[in-house]
Amino acid sequence: MAQWACPLWQGLDQIDIALQQAQARWPALGSDTRHAITMSGEMVDAFEHREEGVQRIADRLAQVLRGEVRLYGGDLGWIAPADAARCWTQIASANWLATAHHAATVFRDGLLVDIGSTTTDLIVLANGRVQTASRSDHERLASGELVYHGVVRTPLCALARHVAFRGPPVNVMNEWFATTADVYRMTGELDPAHDQQPSADARSKDRTATRQRPARMIGLDARDAEDDEWLALAKAWRQAQIEEIAASLTRMMATRCGITSAGTIVTAGCGAFLVPDLAARVPALTGWPLRSYGCDVARIAATDDGAADASKADWAQVCAPSVAVASLYAQEPC
């Protein structure tokens, strides 16, 4: 498993660059390779609309990849690139659904919480099924099942209008001075392997620069406070993000839950480290055990004694949609 940054808003050639890196990593990929694909890149502003995005991404992948190519279409199953235009609504941003479908094959009742670099998915699983009628990003934003919060790319000004610093709350500048990656770099929770996006100012991610960016959010510089004060500020931002996600989760569980007894919380994404504190803030989740997508759903990379290989399980956790489509396609190819 591997992932590469793909700033698709800069043009379709970014797909080619990412695929070249994949080919270098796995040079044996050839005409006998089967490719199971899900996407979310159709939303970028390089495309006039999402339909165009799905079709152009599908076309480019079909041109570049050798071997069989199939697109995950959720309830429609597997779709050939030639049919992408006709089925674009099912293909668009269906990555969350693949992860949820795969998780539901293992945990019949529960909740998938996938906190990634940019977004958070909150999906109820009931009776071995994905318990939501929502399919599009718009529908999931309306229901609260999609929260546009992640642990890498989210601007800090999107988390809160004010934040505690040296006592009373301080109003926050509505500027793209810093992102959540700075926060979780400061707290030590963000794995450097998953810190793939440029910083807000395109400068270093070292200790000083990482503090300078959040400092700007409250009108200061890194030199204006001590290390423990900047760590306290990072923790305040962290708490603000947890509260925002918890508010959506509380509303969603009150109105959309089809589970009558305690279920299992399945964690996924590079921000899975937030889930224990998040769950603790939602009364409806009291007593629900936490399980990892990488270890308990993907179940890949087991060692001889049956235990999960920690490194590969971590990557499966972060790359959950990719692992999910590969697993689902292996179980039920078209």
Predicted regions and their residues:
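Nucleotide/phosphate-binding catalytic cleft detector across ATP-hydrolyzing
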Residues: 2-113, 123-334
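Glycine-rich anion/phosphate-binding loop at the beta-strand->alpha-helix junction
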Residues: 118-122
